[in-house]
């Protein structure tokens, strides 16, 4: 059976003032996506009414639909196979290491992973920008509209900026630093969280966010994590609207203010991403644990989705 297995990373989007633009890929947690061409022992393709079948295991997999048109990865695979006239039966198996609804790009990891897998399995040789375009289509299932702020880092790795939506333009910057992520056991719907974001904002808030976002980009010139974190905490638009969705978030920010370079909500939450001072990692972990009693990840930034196994 011809197959390819992909490791696809968790991602953190927005990062304060970079709403729907900035994203980071993390080394941990991650999803594993296996895509196989289904054949009988004799080598003939298995006859089926469904060209694509999906199976799941892992984090909250029972809550994720496996119908192709309702599954983020299924939507991506179907569109790619239609566009490139791929007349094969495939099996998609997703091992969820990223909790759905976490604010860590769970759906994006599946979308990106299957896009990379289809590209590899059928030798399409698509550039990363095209893979992001396809992967972002799956995000419409999870968020109500296609958006690329999570799938871009899930494919490129490191730090990405979605500088234009149509036509899609992405800037990728390789960066190296460690983040500490807390995942409170709180349910937040991506769609509901997006609805909290104001449709119009005061010009002073726009000026603030543009300035702080520019400062963050400048800080990456020499990997200045202290400056990056400082500006990451100064979003005047989105974080204030969403902070109330996460119990004790404001109190935790106050407790760790001298222990981290920066802290903010990851994506639509509930995950919290922080940039701890190296000597303060254990203390910040303790505060997170005592407050939320939740999973905590201390991780470097990661590569984009990549092949871990391939069989002809």
Curated annotation (Swiss-Prot):
GO terms for molecular function: ATP binding; homoserine kinase activity. It holds the Pfam family GHMP_kinases_C. It is found in: Cytoplasm. It catalyses: L-homoserine + ATP = O-phospho-L-homoserine + ADP + H(+). InterPro entries: GHMP_kinase_C_dom, GHMP_kinase_C_sf, GHMP_kinase_N_dom, GHMP_knse_ATP-bd_CS, Homoserine_kinase, Ribosomal_Su5_D2-typ_SF, Ribsml_uS5_D2-typ_fold_subgr. PROSITE patterns: GHMP_KINASES_ATP. It is an enzyme of class 2 (transferase). Pathway: Amino-acid biosynthesis; L-threonine biosynthesis; L-threonine from L-aspartate: step 4/5. One of its GO terms (biological process) is threonine biosynthetic process. Keywords: Amino-acid biosynthesis, ATP-binding, Cytoplasm, Kinase, Nucleotide-binding, Threonine biosynthesis, Transferase. GO terms for cellular component: cytoplasm. ATP binds at residues 99-109. Its EC number is 2.7.1.39. Catalyzes the ATP-dependent phosphorylation of L-homoserine to L-homoserine phosphate. Belongs to the GHMP kinase family. Homoserine kinase subfamily. NCBIfam families: PRK01212.1-4 (NF002288), thrB (TIGR00191). This is Homoserine kinase. The gene is thrB.
């Amino acid at each position: 059976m011809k197959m390819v297995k992909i490791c696809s990373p968790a991602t953190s989007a927005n990062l304060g003032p970079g709403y729907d633009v900035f994203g980071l890929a993390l080394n941990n947690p991650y999803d594993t996506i296996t895509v196989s061409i289904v054949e009988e022992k004799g080598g003939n393709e298995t006859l089926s009414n469904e060209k694509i079948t999906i199976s799941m295991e892992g984090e909250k997999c029972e809550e994720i639909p496996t119908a192709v048109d309702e599954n983020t990865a299924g939507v991506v695979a179907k569109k790619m196979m239609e566009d490139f006239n791929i007349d094969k039966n495939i099996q998609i198996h997703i091992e969820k290491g990223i909790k759905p609804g976490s604010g860590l790009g769970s759906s994006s990891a599946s979308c990106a992973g299957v896009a990379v897998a289809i590209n590899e399995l059928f030798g399409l040789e698509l550039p990363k920008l095209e893979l992001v375009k396809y992967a972002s289509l799956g995000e419409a299932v999870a968020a109500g509209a296609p958006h690329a702020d999570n799938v871009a880092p899930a494919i490129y790795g490191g730090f990405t900026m979605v500088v234009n939506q149509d036509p899609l333009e992405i800037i990728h910057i390789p960066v190296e630093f460690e983040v500490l992520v807390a995942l409170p056991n709180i349910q937040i719907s991506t769609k509901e969280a997006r609805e909290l974001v104001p449709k119009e904002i005061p010009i002073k808030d726009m000026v603030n966010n543009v300035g702080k976002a520019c400062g963050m980009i400048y800080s990456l010139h020499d990997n200045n994590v202290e400056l990056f974190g400082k500006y990451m905490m100064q979003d005047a638009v989105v974080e204030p609207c969403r902070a109330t969705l996460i119990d004790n978030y404001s109190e935790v920010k106050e407790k760790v203010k001298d222990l981290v370079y920066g802290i903010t909500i990851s994506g639509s939450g509930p995950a919290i991403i922080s940039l701890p001072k190296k000597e303060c990692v254990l203390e910040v972990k303790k505060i997170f644990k005592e407050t939320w009693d939740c999973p905590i990840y201390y991780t470097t930034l990661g590569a984009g989705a990549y092949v871990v196994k391939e069989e002809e």
